[in-house]
Amino acid sequence: MNSQNIRIRLKAFDHRILDTSTREIVSTAKRTGANVRGPIPLPTRIEKFTVNRGPHIDKKSREQFEMRTHKRLLDIVDPTPQTVDALMKLDLSAGVDVEIKL
């Protein structure tokens, strides 16, 4: 028996927006009769930037900034046609990057 999975990978800088988007996707998938595995939290990517505080000399005075990219993974097992249609029509937050693999 051949089962089809939909793998959804979400990325965002703000983890609260990411969690609300995953909740929306999970509730939509369960409402249409599909099984959902996840959300699985993936490792957070942290990019650090170090800059001088002043425009002139004084190399000892520096400031660090970081940018965190939070990620989640969802697997939808045996999706129905209603599930696929509902996921395509779903409107998520602007700060969330969605990758869908069939």
UniProtKB/Swiss-Prot annotation:
Any one Gene Ontology cellular component term annotated for this protein: ribonucleoprotein complex
Entry-linked HAMAP family: Ribosomal_uS10
Gene3D superfamilies for this protein: Ribosomal protein S10 domain
NCBIfam families referenced in this protein's UniProt entry, alphabetically: PRK00596.1, rpsJ_bact
InterPro entries: Ribosomal_uS10, Ribosomal_uS10_CS, Ribosomal_uS10_dom, Ribosomal_uS10_dom_sf
Name of protein: Small ribosomal subunit protein uS10
UniProt KW Ubl conjugation keyword: no
Swiss-Prot/TrEMBL keywords: Ribonucleoprotein, Ribosomal protein
SMART domains referenced in this protein's UniProt entry, alphabetically: Ribosomal_S10 (SM01403)
Function: Involved in the binding of tRNA to the ribosomes.
Origin: domain of life: Bacteria
Family statement: Belongs to the universal ribosomal protein uS10 family.
Any one GO molecular-function label of the UniProt entry: structural constituent of ribosome
Gene Ontology biological process terms from the UniProt entry: translation
Ribosomal protein in keyword set: yes
Species for this entry: Bartonella tribocorum (strain CIP 105476 / IBS 506)
Quaternary assembly: Part of the 30S ribosomal subunit.
